[in-house]
């Protein structure tokens, strides 16, 4: 016997096998559930445009993409994921994407930003779950997404100079993080990781050029570094620098912010 039902984006097939022992007139029943998901596997999601205006998403699926991938014949390339599921592509170019996990709906999602929208896209069939009006509790007066980042238990969003950080367990973005009103993120560059705080704090570091100091954050709380006058490098008194890149270093632990050669290469 077999019965099927659609739960979210998964097809649940419940099978039952009955075996009859005719010698003793006994029936043995075995039940199991088979979950069938979408045809898309793990891979690299790429945003692209064909006409310079609209944009879409493609998925390159290959078990060893970064080591041996050498063309479509080595794996599967799925194109026009947004158009095929939603009826049309994004109306403008994609500016940022972030892969993360939605604890509320218990599914993997993509945050996708364009010049005038911020969307959540599920990764089974690439259906658009919501737009900027759904993403923000209070829609900002201006949408200018500069960064989308994974931090510890949170998603961090830089929009028009404001710092937002929302828990993975919350489906919507509220207001800018309290205490960050006077902070600015130079060039929108942040070094961030999502490791547990028991192993690595802080989860974010950035440079505030207006204050001339470095700032750091963890779990929706941000601080400006205090001055350390006796140190060769004073993170609380470092005016006139510019930040051009940031990330976690090759040791998979150290926050790194890259400054122009004329200043220095700083590791905080």
What is the predicted role of each segment?
Residues 2, 6-15, 264-268:
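Conserved small/polar residues in nucleotide/adenosyl-binding loops
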Residues 22-24:
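Short acidic/polar inter-strand loop motif in beta-rich domains
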Residues 28-41:
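C-terminal edge beta-strand
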Residues 47-113:
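Conserved, compact domain cores that house catalytic/ligand-binding motifs in diverse enzymes
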Residues 107-267:
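Preference for solvent-exposed, low-hydrophobicity sequence contexts
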